[in-house]
Amino acid sequence: MLSTILQAAENFCAHQIRLPHTIESTLPKKRTLIAYLDIETHDGDKHRAYVGCDSVLIQHISEIFLGEEESDEETLTDMLLETTNMIIGSAKVIALESAHPEFTITTPHFFQHDQFTMPADGYHTIYIADGEMGIALKAL
């Protein structure tokens, strides 16, 4: 499932924000705004997906989508929730079109503004422009 989410995140970088990126199997180094949503496969497996963006990246995403050069904290949080929904929603579509298990998702929730250190089964960092996006998945 994590590979499907990473594919969706790469698609987000390439097609939504149109920025070059690289992926590493590491934790983000910067302090990030973090959101999560829960995923349940049709087999009954449950996971929590985390998406986090540092302030540089989420502001850049906000500027791309909203045209705001300097967004307030509430707008950045809303943009993070929308980014999380776009990425995990895209992963759901990818799963439907491939051999991966289908799943349902909940509404994204704001988690925290801190280091990306929550317990998880897998972590990846996507380096985009001068920013970082963290992706993590945890079985529930």
Regions found by a protein language model. Give the residues of each.
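N-terminal auxiliary interaction/assembly segments of multi-subunit proteins
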Residues: M1-L140
